[in-house]
Amino acid sequence: MRQKMAVFTGRLEIIEYPGVVVREPVLLKPIYVYIGDLERSIIEGLLPLNPPVVLGSFGVARVIEVSGSNTEYTGRVFTVKPFGDHGILGVEVDGLLANYTSIHPSYLDDVLLDPKPIDSIKPLIKHSTSIAMESLEPVLIEGCGLTALLTGLALRYIGVEPAYYCEQSSKLVLQYGFTIYKHIGDVVEKWGSIVLTSINQASKYKLTTRLDYKKLIISPLSFTQCIPLKKRESLFSINIFSRVSSEESSVVNKVSSDLAKIIRVVEVEDLKNILGLLPPRSPGFILSLK
């Protein structure tokens, strides 16, 4: 049983071992892996990390073997989320872009009986929906990547129409008819919530220092290390990466249906075939590993 992995070493490489290297308790065989904003940021050198690291933060995988406890997971298919005990999967610890990989059990999410490609993005949809549920009106979303779009769609489904601040490409969000600000001078000053989703530090700095808001919501996927803040009477900083409740599942399903219309699925028989597909264009794609 040979192991192939898409590893970022300063550049993207496909590394092959004659056997399977198991570093974490849960050995997985990935089935679907979503490739999107995080992988693009890493490959283009926009997101600093300590290489080498196996890419792939979101996906669906079958558990092949478990060491220690949780042996009941063996043979089951799970969605895999990027949030766990050891940092962000595919960025701070080895991810899913491999024919076999091992992870800590804290990254396993839902058990799937009939896995579909769109399930690979369900953890991101759930994360974005959780952010939407925590937001106070009016809502300004910083960034125009997939996390930002999904948060906006979830807000729309619960009756809140957000606005966006995007210094870079806004094409993905624009096609859904949201209000988009491109220049800080055009942005309305007072907001209920500002949601930070991008890795653009300059963008986040402008919003948090120049605008008034009651609540600041920070996605861990924005890799926000620190933010200079003005003194305010009421300010909260929140990292949201919890599971969604059953109350939110209808919103998750609606957003999933929307996303399935714009995300393509690419089948590959060998990981070497993905090199020409990376870095991915927005909104990314789902890799189906045979």
State the predicted function of each range:
Residues 1-3:
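Extreme N-terminal starter segment of soluble prokaryotic enzymes
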Residues 136, 174-239:
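Glycine-rich cofactor phosphate-binding loops and adjacent beta1-alpha1 units
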Residues 20-34, 44-84:
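Glycine-rich beta-strand-centered segment in the early N-terminal region that forms part
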Residues 81, 141-145, 165-168, 196-201, ...:
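Structural motif
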Residues 116-189:
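Mid-domain Rossmann-like dinucleotide-binding core that forms the NAD(H)/NADP(H) cofactor-binding site
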Residues 140, 244-290:
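C-terminal hydrophobic helical "lid"/dimerization subdomain
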Residues 5-13:
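Extracellular beta-rich ligand/substrate-recognition surface
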Residues 80-141:
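NAD(P)H dinucleotide-binding glycine-rich loop of Rossmann-like/cofactor-binding domains
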